[in-house]
Design a protein with these regions (language model features):
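The feature encodes the CheY-like receiver
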Residues: 62-63, 90
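Conserved acidic segment of CheY-like receiver
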Residues: 5-16, 21, 25
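Acidic catalytic/metal-coordinating carboxylates
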Residues: 39-42, 65-68
Length: 125
């Protein structure tokens, strides 16, 4: 891990999305991916193990969805920074996640500059 870069946990059941997020994030000067989870149960465990500075969270996943996972992570660490990464048409879920404590939202499909903007805005603090 590079010194001073923010540590990111990427949570998404789609390997392609995790790979894209990892590629984009690791190219930035501000952050790097330290762990990946394919479901919410794994995400909570990895959050406790790695204590990342920020989590990118899919909403619809097997075993445990993003809203429940957001709640569990925030119950462990109320200062956790969680950014929802979700597809068009899931506005109600995104709104619910925001009410539960998610800090920002990135819509799929996303572009590299959108990810970088959120990293600077949320993790760059």
């Amino acid at each position: 891990m590079t010194k001073n870069k923010k540590k990111i946990l990427v949570v998404d059941d789609a390997q392609f999305t995790r790979n894209m997020l990892k590629k984009i994030i690791n190219k930035t000067e501000i952050a790097e991916v330290i762990a990946e989870a394919s479901n919410g149960v794994e995400a909570v465990s990895l959050y406790q193990e790695y204590k990342p500075d920020m989590v990118t969270m899919d909403l619809v996943m097997p075993e445990q969805g993003g809203i429940e996972t957001t709640e569990k992570i925030l119950s462990i660490d109320p200062d956790a920074i969680i950014v929802i990464v979700s597809a068009l048409g899931q506005e109600a879920l995104v709104l619910e996640a925001a009410k539960k404590g998610a800090k920002d939202f990135i819509q799929k499909p996303f572009k590299a500059d959108q990810i970088e903007d959120v990293l600077e805005r949320v993790a760059g603090k």
